[in-house]
Amino acid sequence: MNSDYKDVFQFEGPLARALPGYAYRPEQAAMAKAVGLALARLEPLIVEAGTGTGKTFAYLVPALLSGRSVIISTGTRTLQDQLFHRDIPLLGKALGLPVRIALLKGRANYLCRHRLELACGQGSLLPDERGAARTLARVSRWAATTKSGDLAELTDLPEQSSIWP
């Protein structure tokens, strides 16, 4: 294991200083070592670890310390947002590293202004649903102010709402 990784995960390392209640987990350190070696050797790696192992930091720490560009794909938007808004900035600060990150999402995650205009103008894109017109009006008000068009900004609108295609 690279001594930098070992130091990061130790009882008095940067993670312990940055995270109240931090506890050293040998499994986490072992996973970080495996990830670090795979990154250094440019080899693929598949890792399985149980709940509470600390998988997120075990792959993020070696990725950040490698200095390489790394792509991290998540299974859920919730984890994606957690990494982008919380975990990566926290680790960058704890490790004293400048971190450049970008959040990439597919086009289904963004407002289509053309479809919104059609729905508002014709109403034909909306199935029969009580309250759909109010919901559409709310989306239209949001669309007038959003800078990104990221549908995640509409936190009070369920992903299963009938107004989404």
What is each model feature region?
Residues 36-40, 56-69, 86-90:
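Walker A/P-loop NTP-binding motif
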Residues 51:
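The conserved Walker
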Residues 29, 54-57:
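Non-catalytic, well-ordered alpha-helical scaffold segments
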Residues 2-18, 69-165:
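A substrate-engagement module of RecA-like helicase motors
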Residues 47, 60, 104:
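Hydrophobic residues at beta-strand termini and immediately following loops
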Residues 2-47:
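Conserved pre-motif I regulatory segment
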Residues 46-48, 71-72:
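Short, conserved beta-strand segments within well-ordered enzyme catalytic domains
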Residues 33, 64, 109:
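Residue-level marker of positions within ordered structural domains that often coincide
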